[in-house]
C-alpha cells in the first residue's frame, strides 16, 4: 500500500470580469491564467473576490476576448453586477504556472522584498489585481505599506525557492 501526499489547494486569480456582453448574461473576462481552456471549462467552479460562487456554463472567444456565461446569470443587469470582480480557482499548491515568469499570489505573499542594491524593504502582504496591472502591497515596519506595480522593469528578480524578490524602484516610488 502506498501513501500519496494529501492534495492541498490554494486560491489563485484566473481572471477579472470586465463588463456584460449582450442581454443574456454573458460577461467579458480579462484572463489572468496560463490555461484559460481548463480554468474556464464548462462546469468549472470559480469564486469572486467577494465570495460569490459561480459555475461556468459555457465560454467563447469574441474579438480576442473571452466571453463567459455563468449558471444563474441570465440577464444583463445581473451580469453587470459582477463587473470588476476578480475570479479565483482552486489549484493544487504543488503545481506551478507553465511560464517561468508567472506566479500565483500565494507564491508571492510573504516574500521578503529588497532593492537591487540589497536594501531591505519589507514583506509582500497582498497582490492587488487592478484593471491595468497587478500591484504588490509591501508591508514595511515603519513607513506603512508601499505599492509597487508587478512589472519586470520594477521587479526584475523573483526567487520562489529563496522566498525573496528584488525591486528596482524609481526615485520617490516607495515614498508614495
UniProtKB/Swiss-Prot annotation:
Its main location: cytoplasm. One of its GO terms (cellular component) is cytoplasm. It is found in: Cytoplasm. Keywords: Chaperone, Cytoplasm, Ribosome biogenesis, rRNA processing. Residues 100-173 form the PRC barrel domain. The PRC barrel domain binds ribosomal protein uS19. Belongs to the RimM family. This is Ribosome maturation factor RimM. The gene is rimM.
Amino acid at each position: 500500500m502506498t501513501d500519496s501526499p494529501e492534495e492541498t489547494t490554494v486560491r489563485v486569480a484566473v481572471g477579472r470580469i470586465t463588463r456584460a456582453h449582450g442581454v443574456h448574461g454573458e460577461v467579458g473576462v480579462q484572463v489572468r491564467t496560463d490555461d484559460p481552456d481548463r480554468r474556464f471549462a464548462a462546469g468549472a467552479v470559480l469564486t469572486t473576490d467577494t465570495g460569490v460562487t459561480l459555475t461556468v456554463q459555457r465560454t467563447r472567444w469574441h474579438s480576442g476576448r473571452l466571453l463567459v456565461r455563468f449558471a444563474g446569470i441570465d440577464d444583463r443587469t445581473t451580469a453587470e453586477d459582477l463587473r470588476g470582480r476578480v475570479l479565483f480557482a482552486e489549484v493544487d499548491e504543488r503545481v506551478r504556472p507553465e511560464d517561468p515568469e508567472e506566479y500565483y499570489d500565494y507564491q508571492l505573499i510573504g516574500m521578503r522584498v529588497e532593492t537591487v542594491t540589497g536594501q531591505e524593504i519589507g514583506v509582500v502582504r497582498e497582490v492587488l489585481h487592478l484593471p491595468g496591472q497587478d500591484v504588490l502591497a509591501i508591508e514595511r515596519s515603519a513607513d506603512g505599506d508601499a505599492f509597487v506595480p508587478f512589472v519586470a522593469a520594477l521587479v526584475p528578480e523573483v526567487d520562489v525557492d529563496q522566498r525573496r524578490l528584488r525591486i528596482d524602484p524609481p526615485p520617490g516610488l516607495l515614498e508614495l
